[in-house]
Amino acid sequence: WIADQLGMDDEQQGHLDRVRPRLWDGMCHQHTIHSQPFSEGRTPGSGQPIGTTAVPVEGGYKVTGKKIFASLSGIADIHNVVAVVEGDPRVRLLGVPAEADGVEIQGDWDPLGMRGTDSRDLILVDAFVPEDHEVLPPGVFDAMVARFPYFYMTLSFTYLGLMRAILDLTGEYLRGEHGVASRRDNHVKQAGWAEMQMIYDKAQSLMYRVLGEASVDPTKPAL
């Protein structure tokens, strides 16, 4: 949807028309899990914000680089990384198959409260990315970041879904559906349940407002 709002030329639209059905089928029907690691640990102002490189080869790209805090590193089927081709300033968004040669997960990850994110280091050394794994046409990622500042808020959908799942499980627990006595009539539990509902409703309302107002090239007052 975001790419459609930016306005595509015929070549870019053709690219989207080709890759979108495969992405949709993979995620919705084959349960393909995508990660999207961006962090590289580079110092701001170093002159090159993206250190991962992509070399065009027959049928796709060879990608080399390192992404830190690569969440879902141990479970993702595809790692969507940003990379640049030498001599071309446009950013590529490339889906690196987890099983491709040259892909390695390094390091330990055992922080209290965040073990489930599995955010280790993703190391890429000449990892082959098929051309149909180029998620967006070259340069469109740049345009989204520059012209659609709401872009990074799309992560909110995942967090809102996690909140909803926690609410559902808590409700089942309070009703005694998991082998414990019902606690739904306990006043302390009722107050806590109400507070959880309010937190969720506020987050959902803000997200719906953003969806209703979001647009390409928003004015400063709109932001």
What are these regions (language model features)?
Residues 1-66:
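Glycine-rich flavin
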Residues 32, 48-50, 75-77, 90, ...:
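A generic structural signal for well-ordered coil/turn residues at beta-strand boundaries
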Residues 46, 71-73, 103-105, 131-134:
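Short helix/loop capping segments that flank catalytic or ligand/cofactor-binding pockets
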Residues 58-62, 78, 119:
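A generic structural signal for beta-strand entry/edge sites
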Residues 63-65, 94, 124, 163, ...:
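Buried hydrophobic positions in well-ordered alpha/beta secondary-structure cores of metabolic enzymes
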Residues 66-104:
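A short core secondary-structure module
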Residues 111-201:
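Glycine-rich beta->alpha junctions and the first turn(s) of the following alpha-helix
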Residues 201-223:
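C-terminal helix-coil-helix/basic helical segment that borders enzyme active sites and/or dimer interfaces
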